[in-house]
């Protein structure tokens, strides 16, 4: 069984269009076990009962940004080992450095191509 058949991914973005585009790309890669939500708090709640291998999260979201969510993931025993990819339109060095300090596994700058997303995922979880 291929990794793409086993991997579980959560997509977190306040923009439904972005969630849809990422989910479509994942589907094109053969990844079908995908959950999505529009904000960090609901993602954290969902992860308590439905763990995933990887979270792909937008940085700029109301209420709780992607780095705040990453901090919560890394300080919770149940989620500290979950892979994390940050997607941001602001790939400034301070954001990326803070993400690395918190345990971010990889990041993508918007806009990105589907193959860039695939390479980013494979760098975190292995070849799809």
What are these regions (language model features)?
Residues 6-17, 22-26, 55:
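Conserved acidic segment of CheY-like receiver
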Residues 58, 88:
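Active-site residues of response regulator receiver
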Residues 23, 36-54:
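Acidic, metal-coordinating helix/loop segments flanking the phosphotransfer/catalytic sites
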Residues 61:
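Receiver (REC) domain active-site loop signature in two-component systems and cognate sites
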Residues 51-53, 78-83:
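His-Asp phosphorelay/catalytic-motif detector in bacterial-type signaling
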């Amino acid at each position: 069984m291929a990794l793409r058949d086993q991997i579980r991914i959560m997509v977190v973005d306040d923009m439904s269009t972005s969630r849809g585009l990422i989910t479509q790309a994942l589907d094109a890669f053969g990844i079908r076990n995908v959950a999505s939500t529009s904000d960090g708090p609901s993602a954290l709640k969902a992860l308590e009962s439905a763990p995933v291998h990887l979270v792909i999260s937008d940085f700029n979201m109301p209420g709780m940004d992607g780095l705040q969510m990453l901090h919560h993931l890394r300080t919770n025993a149940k989620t500290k080992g979950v892979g994390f990819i940050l997607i941001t339109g602001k790939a400034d060095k301070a954001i990326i450095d803070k993400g690395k300090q918190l345990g971010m596994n990889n990041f993508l700058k918007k806009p990105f191509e589907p193959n860039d997303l695939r390479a980013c995922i494979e760098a975190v979880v292995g070849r799809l």
